[in-house]
Amino acid sequence: EKMHIRPLTDLIHKRGGVIMLIKIEAIVREEKFEQVKSALQDIQVNGVTISQVMGYGTQRGYTEIVRGSEVDILLHPKIKFEVVVSSEEWEQKTISAIQKAAFTGEVGDGKIFSYEIRSAVKIRTKETGYNAVQSQDNL
């Protein structure tokens, strides 16, 4: 299923005349996958990478009975969403959409991180920076 492609040229963040890219990583509960994916589609993000990951934070591990024995499970299955945007406005809009969609109020809801990207290269076309992440076609 393709995400809707939306030009980002109306909302861009520049530093020294160069468009700055911001990467947002969100690690959320597996059961929130569809809600977060839909929230990102609703705000028309330009693209997203989604991965299944394992980890723990304040939630820590838990004990489970496996074949009659107690086993400590240290890592929890999670879903990681990665989105690249080109403005602080889009950064806040994206974080807000993810936070709202992923929220349960319980320990283990996840984390959202954002940081500036130093460089980006589209392998197929050799485009760099903003042009590397701005889709001009559906290929």
Predicted segment positions?
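Positively charged, small/polar-rich N-terminal and surface patches that mediate targeting and assembly
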Residues: H4-L139
